[in-house]
């Protein structure tokens, strides 16, 4: 069982880890805090080493947890011969380009500020996505609520026609994720 926790002290996660231990189930902790309870009690530990979290939205920890899970998935795929060593290396190489891509986004302050100024008075913001994009929509909506205190919800794109669309009115911002 893989247990992911920023602090390594999350009560529900610790309880799950201890239940696994009682039942002789191997555990891997993915944690940020060295020496935390989960780090000490898990059979193996993968440290994200994101450093202290300043933001209430825990953006650094979340990002490093995703990367840790991705790298672990790559290793599983390689061991199971689902991908070759070369493919794995290519995926890791692409992953290493993320810091530069993040830097470019953050440097585009004028466009970000312009957009934010146009949308800051939105009463509601809906994030829409399908499959993996829905997961990203859930996290995007949570981050928006935690940081801006604007009401936000995430919906699976396929559910839009089942009532959700009736919630969209003038002044509602809709963020659609179409990565896949």
Residue ranges and their predicted role:
Residues 1-69, 74-77:
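Phosphate/diphosphate-binding loops
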Residues 1-5, 10, 166-176:
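Long, low-complexity, intrinsically disordered polar/charged segments
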Residues 44-175:
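Active-site phosphate/pyrophosphate-binding segments
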